[in-house]
Amino acid sequence: MNNLTLSLRRERRLLVLLALVCLALLAGALYLQYVKNEDPCPLCIIQRYFFVLIAVFAFIGAGMASGAGVAVTEALIVLSAAAGVGTAARHLYVQLNPGFSCGFDALQPVVDSLPPARWLPGVFKVAGLCETVYPPIFGILLPGWALIAFVLIAVPVAVSLLRHRGRLR
């Protein structure tokens, strides 16, 4: 086996691991929703969508036969994670500055009208407000944990993509 084959095999294994981590994060969110009764807000649901996208792209990338296909899916993962960073940062800002609450979240009808909210309402249906602050986990609010997760996904995948850009063709 040459170095390119070994590198591609390692990338695929890491993509499967990344997808499983994203699914575990979604399972954790569902645990908080159904066991701890922490209703998801529109920004929570949008973050769930980004974790699902990352998992889907990672599984697709793991099944790619070519380095170029892996690189494309890794680029999509980085874009999804970057969008997740923005969403989680906004959510954290809203929770840390709740002064402008009106009791209605304008994003709710938009998020609830997306097809997955009809297909899997228990996972993707809005039930809470973005400014509702639930107890922190190890001193960090839930949007803070999502922000950390998205950064920990985006940075290594982007570095891997840049490092292997010539070898994964």
From Swiss-Prot:
GO CC annotation terms, alphabetical: plasma membrane
Disulfide bonds: 41-44, 102-130
A GO term, aspect molecular function: electron transfer activity
Keyword annotations: Cell inner membrane, Cell membrane, Chaperone, Disulfide bond, Electron transport, Membrane, Oxidoreductase, Redox-active center, Transmembrane, Transmembrane helix, Transport
Pfam families from the UniProt entry: DsbB
InterPro entries: DiS_bond_form_DsbB/BdbC, Disulphide_bond_form_DsbB, DsbB, DsbB-like_sf
Protein name in UniProt: Disulfide bond formation protein B
